Design a protein with these regions (language model features):
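Recognition helix of helix-turn-helix DNA-binding domains
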Residues: 164-199
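Active-site beta3 strand of CheY-like receiver
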Residues: 45-51
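Two-component/phosphorelay signaling modules centered on CheY-like receiver
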Residues: 12-30
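Active-site residues of response regulator receiver
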Residues: 53, 81
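Acidic catalytic/metal-coordinating carboxylates
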Residues: 34-37, 58-63, 84
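Basic, Lys/Arg-enriched C-terminal extension of HTH/homeodomain DNA-binding domains
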Residues: 186-219
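Short, flexible helix-to-coil linker/hinge segments that flank and couple to helix-turn-helix
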Residues: 87-94, 98-152, 156, 206-212
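Short amphipathic alpha-helix used as the core "switch/output" element in two-component signaling
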Residues: 40, 62-74
Length: 219
């Protein structure tokens, strides 16, 4: 019986290409374009493996992964991203991912990452030093301390603020009042000891809510 795969990426052209690649080996049951859609489809379809990007609108892949892990979903997670970022890789493994691979990697590497996840192993992109996979596997055994400091709603507000949305826009996306959105932001800043919006964005980057280190091909 072929393993069932759920894909998540906001760029449809990429999920279409990835779907064609993986359909040689697995059943691709659905594709999601944001974190909320990913959560809904994952709970409905209970795939064996979820292959997701980190950077997605509304709710990022890391928070979607975190929410699904807390829900008790037994799917394995492969992070497939453009970001060659050690901090994000650590965050992904701590949050529950089995593999972290780059979009610019080979099709064989993507296949290997999914196979590793299916068989209970960890896999790290060959773009990183080989010995780091041991470090990341150890990180996976520790709790997600940074993420645990904020509630899910606070993290939603934080991501939207870090993406550059106004508080009115944040409120509209989340279906809450502007005053409530502002209250979430104020309480976050107070509890984290953060004084400015710029520091809040830096915190969002540090815990992996948004990523700013895209992989550039060599000149």
């Amino acid at each position: 019986m072929r393993a069932r795969i759920l894909l998540a990426d906001h760029q449809r052209i990429l999920t279409d290409g990835l779907s064609k690649l993986l359909e040689q080996f697995y059943d691709v049951v659905a594709t999601a374009t944001n974190g909320y859609e990913l959560i809904s489809l994952a709970k409905e379809l209970t795939p064996d493996v979820i292959v997701t990007e980190i950077s997605m609108p509304l709710l990022n892949g890391m928070d979607a992964l975190r929410a699904l892990k807390k829900s008790g979903l037994r799917s394995k997670f492969v992070v497939l991203t453009m970001h060659l970022d050690m901090g994000l890789a650590v965050q992904a493994f701590r949050t529950g991912a089995s593999a972290y691979v780059l979009k610019l990697g080979s099709s064989e590497e993507i296949h290997a990452a999914v196979e590793a996840a299916l068989h209970g192993r960890y896999y790290l992109s060959s773009a990183f030093p080989a010995d780091l996979v041991t470090v990341l596997a150890e990180a996976a055994r520790h709790s997600d301390e940074d993420g645990a400091r904020l509630s899910r709603r606070q993290r939603e507000v934080l991501q939207l603020v870090a993406e550059g949305k106004t508080m009115k826009e944040v409120a509209a996306v989340l279906g809450i009042s502007t005053r409530t959105a502002e209250s979430y932001k104020y309480e976050m800043m107070r509890s984290l000891g953060i004084r400015t919006s710029a520091e809040l964005v830096q915190y969002a980057i540090r815990i992996g809510l948004i990523a700013v280190t895209p992989l550039r091909s060599a000149a």
